[in-house]
Each structure stands twice: as C-alpha cells, then as structure tokens.
C-alpha cells in the first residue's frame, strides 16, 4: 500500500512522557518482571509486542501520536531476562530517556526488523497471532526462528486494576459526572435552541470537562 499511496500524512511525532507512579500504581520495572516470569514459564526467549496500549501500560509511558488516545507509535520486544527492547524514534523519548534506560534499551523504530533477524535460530519467539503483522512472522521464518503463538501477556495483567488505578477511575467518573450534570442543567435551563446546534453543545461540554485539573485529550 505504501508504494502506491500518495500524499500520505506525516508520521506522528509527539513527545513521550512518563505516566506517573502515583497514577499507575505499579512501576514499569515490576510489571516487566511479572511478564518475564510468564515468558519463562512458557519457554519463550523473546516476545514481540506490537499493541500500543500494552506497551504504554507495561512501560508507564504515554504519547499523543493518535488523536484522543494517549499512545506512542512504537514496538517492543520483551526478553525473558533483562531490559525491554523499545523501538521508537529517539527524539520522541529524548526528554524521558534517562528514566527509561533504567529498564529499557532504546532503538530506532525501523531497526526492529534487523534485531529480530539476529535473534538466533535456537531461540523461541512469542507473538500474538491476532495482533502481530505478518512481516514479523516472515522475518522469523526466514531466520529459522521458532514461533510460539501466545496471546498478548499484558492483556490480563492490564485488565486487573490495582487499588490506585481503581481509585483513579472512580475519581475520574466523579469529575466527569460533575461536568455532565452542569451540561444537563445548561441544556435544560439556559441553552437557547435558536442559537445552539449539536456542535456548539458538544463544544460546551468539552469546555466543562477541560476545567478539571487532570483532563487530557
């Protein structure tokens, strides 16, 4: 598709930032240890992780590469031991590089293909069949690397919210509920139908939500 798609939009270049521990509830290093234990139990040497929300959760990082979703365009490879290999444009993580390098080895985005090719034919690589591009499978097969199709190991741990995450979700709903209440009052008692349309109403609600300290969009 890239060969024939003219006038493609520019590749997103947002800057990554750390999702603070006071909101995450668990350090990235600790999450990595847990995932690596699950890889060891299934005899997987490396796991190719392409799910952006899983990478964001695992490393406690966020970005703004996708509208309305705080994600960073990147890939990750989780080894059974040691630092996670993160493939992302260097300028995106420059401001948080020192923090990340405590548990991450950063690489250029495109170098993931070369990295996989050099893993070694005696290694077992895990990947989620539903989430991983065929190109990664092809590289593994061409390099005589054994593939073990395994569901994304971050999915269930990410779904099991810790107490800080649960508290954050509840507080977010309380804040948003206050915005909705103000909006409904405005809709019923103040709004003039002749001067308002759906877009103006949506903008009014958005501005109410923006009044809260932790609003992000």
PLM segments and residue spans:
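Active-site neighborhoods and metal-handling regions in enzymes and metal-associated proteins
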Residues: 1-217
